[in-house]
Amino acid sequence: MAFMPPTPPKSLLGRHRLLAPSASVRVSPLCLGGMSIGNAWQGGMGECTKEMAFELLDTFYDLGGNFIDTANTYQGGESEQWIGEWMAKNNRRSEMVVSTKYTMSPKTGHPIQQSNFGGTGSKSLHLSIHNSLKALQTDYVDVLYVHCWDYATEIPELMHSLNVLINQGKVLYLGISDAPAWIVTKANMYARQNGLRPFSLYQGRYSAQERDLEREIIPMCQEEGMALQPFGVLGSGLFKSPDKPDTGARRMPPPMLIGREESLSKVLDAVAKRHNVPITSVALAYVLQKAPNVFPVLGGRKPEHLKANIEALSLELTAEDVQEIEKGYDFDIGFPHKFLGFGGMIRGPQDINILTMMGHFDYVAPKKAIRPHQGELTAPQGPA
């Protein structure tokens, strides 16, 4: 039998990866964030006309991207609507892996009784998925996220309600965002004990300037077989080389600011100059190489920024680069991790201090991130 070779990828975005051990769908290594797709939030995020949005989506698709993230509240609903219109216009729904979210109320400010349009309960879920499928012009979403944990819904109600959608074919995989690790592990344990689909993805804020996920979330994802979708990887657009003037184009609300953007930019810029790459490439490569199954969510409105981010997929940081970046601010891993280990993220028994005093041991190496691809785009993946 003669096997036809696949079409060569146009960029590293077209070398797709398995999403997670618990989710075997294949996705592009970068996910296009839909928060900036729409014009309803122009005052806070800048202008994005439908023509601009479609150009960005076309560029993402043409370069091999197939993973798009949105939510029921983004841009007052325009994000889902425009993404759905773009997929329908080009007949690309089957090629794309689309995630959306529920929990935050899309009716804020409307003169109606809003009690059940938000939250993690069954009615909020029912209303949200109905409207999301209509807006996206599809009969299913690949991933449905719990957008944030509201501490109001019991785990059994949540997991059974989500799995009703799984059984109906309206949702393929489940994700959770902005929630404590203990909630996720408790929910996944309940799901497995009751023959239900567990969470396969976690979305949270993570970057060189905000490494909180290293305490509990990243180890949890690896133990649970989950992918990590970090947002804010590029400092919410505020990682900038000191050599370049601030245009003021990015208008980020104060709650999204960390306060370390300027100092971390200097550290990242020093590494970027050694590699002769943009500062954003270093910020992106750092997150991609920290753990396996990491798929950053990248926003923005300009195709040229997207193309620059794709180039980061070929950048391999050295151990010295990573150490330099992590000295950019004093990250405290906290108790009990600092008590058990050596001050960094614990990946296994090799990182536990009391064991190192008991002898010399060999352990199976922890799972690592995929190394940046080098050489021809069609060349086989190199050794880890």
From Swiss-Prot:
Pathway: Secondary metabolite biosynthesis. It comes from the Eukaryota. NADP(+) binds at residues 69, 177-178, 203, 301-309. The active site is at residue 74. Induction: The expression of the dibenzodioxocinones biosynthesis cluster is positively regulated by the transcription factor dibT. Aryl-alcohol dehydrogenase; part of the gene cluster that mediates the biosynthesis of dibenzodioxocinones such as pestalotiollide B, a novel class of inhibitors against cholesterol ester transfer protein (CEPT). The biosynthesis initiates from condensation of acetate and malonate units catalyzed by the non-reducing PKS pks8/GME11356. Pks8/GME11356 lacks a thioesterase (TE) domain, which is important to the cyclizing of the third ring of atrochrysone carboxylic acid, and the esterase GME11355 might play the role of TE and catalyzes the cyclization reaction of the C ring. This is Aryl-alcohol dehydrogenase GME11368. It comes from Pestalotiopsis microspora.
